[in-house]
Regions:
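Alpha-helical membrane-interface segments at transmembrane helix boundaries
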Residues: 33, 87-99, 122, 129-132, ...
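Hydrophobic alpha-helical transmembrane segments of polytopic membrane proteins
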Residues: 236-273
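Transmembrane alpha-helical segments of polytopic membrane transport and secretion proteins
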Residues: 1-41, 267-280
Length: 280
């Protein structure tokens, strides 16, 4: 008769402690509580948005209803000779946002690296960067329209809103690099370019991720503002068009799509952050 093999014994030293398991359960409960509160808040908002206009507590002409958004979306899906499909409008806005967002990050990193490399240049440009970042960029929409034309003025607006804050954020991240790491690299004979690429840039990954999160919203704002003024395509144009003909269903549908687009972009960057931070 064959002998039944005993189950392998789990090393008690490798088993998670009771305190750790309790902490994990508490973390899961907290996450579920937060998600539940977020969902409840959204539901309360939607219910109030639906009920208050129907009860004539607020004027439905100025708010529309959540229940009207889906029929409006379906209606706008069909392209007409006078109006493009809402999917075309959405794609136009997303494309312009991605272009402006990417340009702001690439130029922001390059300019911040130049300012880190030449500290004298930073001392000269610092007040101008601060003033440029503080200026209301919407005042430049007509100027960009004259300089760049209807299409490229939207990209210019997106870049203008997000570039300066990107430069300042990333430069401050570069300056916050641990000086002991820089001294250690210098001790081993690292050149300035090696210090930048091997020490400063890797050490500034959290700042770069933070700049990505800030930029995705700013770039979208810049695109929508540009579309208000100079476009005949995009969600910003659709909002402007709907408000001019007093069709709040169109306005609210476009705003809802903007909220969904910005949320998806933010989630994509959060996923990228999780991947990068795991590999550090």
């Amino acid at each position: 008769m064959s002998k039944v093999e005993a189950a392998p014994r789990i090393d008690q030293a490798l088993a998670p402690s009771a305190e750790y398991l309790a902490w994990l359960r508490a973390e899961r409960r907290e996450q579920l509580t937060v998600r539940g509160a977020q969902l409840a808040l959204l539901l309360v908002f939607l219910v109030l948005w639906e009920v208050l206009p129907r009860a004539q507590i607020i004027n439905p002409l100025f708010t529309s209803y959540p229940s009207a958004l889906w029929p409006t979306f379906v209606e706008l899906l069909a392209a007409t000779p006078q109006q493009a499909s809402i999917l075309t409008h959405t794609w136009s806005t997303v494309l312009a946002t991605v272009v402006g967002f990417t340009a702001a990050m690439v130029l922001g990193i390059a300019i911040a690296a130049a300012l880190w490399w030449w500290q004298g240049l930073y001392r000269v440009l610092d007040p101008y960067l601060v003033v440029a970042n503080a200026m209301p960029k919407t005042a430049f929409v007509p100027i960009f329209y004259l300089w760049l034309g209807a299409t490229f003025s939207i990209y210019g607006m997106s870049l203008a809103i997000s570039l300066f804050v990107t430069v300042l954020m990333i430069y401050n991240g570069f300056q916050g690099t641990d000086p002991n790491k820089i001294k250690l690299a210098q001790t081993f004979g690292a050149s300035k370019s090696q210090i930048l690429t091997k020490v400063v840039l890797p050490g500034s990954v959290p700042t770069l991720i933070a700049a990505l999160k800030v930029n995705v919203g700013l770039s979208l704002v810049g695109v929508v503002v540009g579309e208000f003024q100079s476009a005949n395509l995009g969600l910003g144009y659709l909002i402007q068009y709907g408000s001019q003909i007093f069709k709040l269903n169109i306005v609210m549908t476009a705003i809802t799509i903007l909220a969904i687009v910005s949320s998806l972009m933010y989630l994509a960057i959060s996923w990228l952050e999780a991947v990068v931070m795991r590999r550090r």
